[in-house]
Amino acid sequence: MFSESLPEDKPVLEVALTELPMVAESLPEDGSGLEVTCDLRLEHKPARTLLLVGRSGNGKSATGNSILGRKAFKSKGRASGVTTACELQSSTLPNGQIINVIDTPGLFSLSPSTEFTCREILRCFSLTKEGIDAVLLVFSLKNRLTEEEKSALFALKILFGSKIVDYMIVVFTNEDSLEDDGDTFEEYLEDSPDFKEILEPCNDRKVLFRNRSNAPVSQKAKQVQELLNYVEEIARLNGKSYMADLSHEIRENETAFQIKQQEILEMKGLYTRQEMLQMKKDMEKSFENQQLRQMMERVETELRETKERLEQQLKEEKSARLELEKRAKEVEKRSSDVVKELNDEQAKRLESESRAKEAVKQSNGVVENLNKELARIKQMATDLQKSKQWCIIM
């Protein structure tokens, strides 16, 4: 059977392939009870570069190690985190594909260390050759979601640009904490509406990672493959790496910097060693400040444009709300006028009915009086007729 723990010096898939013959020997000759899906075709795939971002202590470094299949990054189970600068490590999969992983310090906060954050972002892109293929936003299931993490997408859009979400995969670490609480992953997300707001813009791309060394090899291989499937999906949907243009620009600036360095070296005989060192130091500082200034200007521009966009959105929403209120008042007024008209018509109708009833009543009284008068006249006529007959007899 596969080893229950992963050797530190071998990638997951390499271990799986190494142990596959031993697994085969332990199976029945007829292969009963075995269902295997295995595709060992050495299909050429381009190198992929993955960027790990998230709060310090969420397990970014451990996740990077799981992806690479070796302890490439320093990782300790503590909230403060151990990564202090961007670092790139690589591994080659059994199919020949190269996977590059960039680990970062916490890059959520826009203040007070904006300059440090910008320096590290520049370093991220200087480490990549063809841009970034996927951004892995790492959360820990054992930690409560902080206010800083709730605004993660906003911060990342400001720092990396609004298109960052098209390249994002959400990675959840510390799966074992769910087992301790007796919850399923789906139940956890159902009770966390903030995560729904984060996952929706990312097309619900999410992977559950177990980074502990005692995790089964098969589980580690499965979670890494699930992640890489998402990476290929992102590459297919977007057609190119993220910020490849910026990476090329940084490398072009570095090339220009190296040319300047060479020019200084060629002037070696014209200046003292101290003067040469000072010139080199000044040039390095100027180059770094130039890149940093450009990056900070981009971040400030993004912040300003975001602020203006939000203000415009609020203005439009306020205008729309006022328009709705105006229309509601107009409808209410029209409704009130209609109700008043209906009430007036009903009052007139009731008054008309009352008058009609009164007229009928009066008419009935007149008819009754006429009938009485007619009966009296008839009686008088009868009496008169009788009186005449009596006179004739006499």
UniProtKB/Swiss-Prot annotation:
Location of the region described as G1 in the Swiss-Prot/TrEMBL record: 54-61
Region (G3): 103-106
Residue numbers spanned by region G5: 210-212
Region (G2): 81-85
Keywords: Coiled coil, GTP-binding, Nucleotide-binding
Domain of life: Eukaryota
Matches recorded under InterPro entries: G_AIG1, GIMA/IAN/Toc, P-loop_NTPase
SUPFAM superfamilies linked to this entry: P-loop containing nucleoside triphosphate hydrolases
Domain AIG1-type G: 45-251
Coiled coil spans: 289-387
PROSITE patterns per record: G_AIG1
Residues annotated to bind GTP: G54, R55, S56, G57, N58, G59, K60, S61, A62, S75, N211
Single annotated GO MF: GTP binding
Induction remark: Down-regulated by aphid infection, 2-aminoethoxyvinylglycine (AVG), high CO(2), isoxaben, and propiconazole treatments. Up-regulated by brassinolides.
Region of interest called G4, as start-end residue ranges on this chain: 173-176
Family (UniProt): Belongs to the TRAFAC class TrmE-Era-EngA-EngB-Septin-like GTPase superfamily. AIG1/Toc34/Toc159-like paraseptin GTPase family. IAN subfamily.
Name recorded for this polypeptide: Immune-associated nucleotide-binding protein 12
Protein source organism: Arabidopsis thaliana
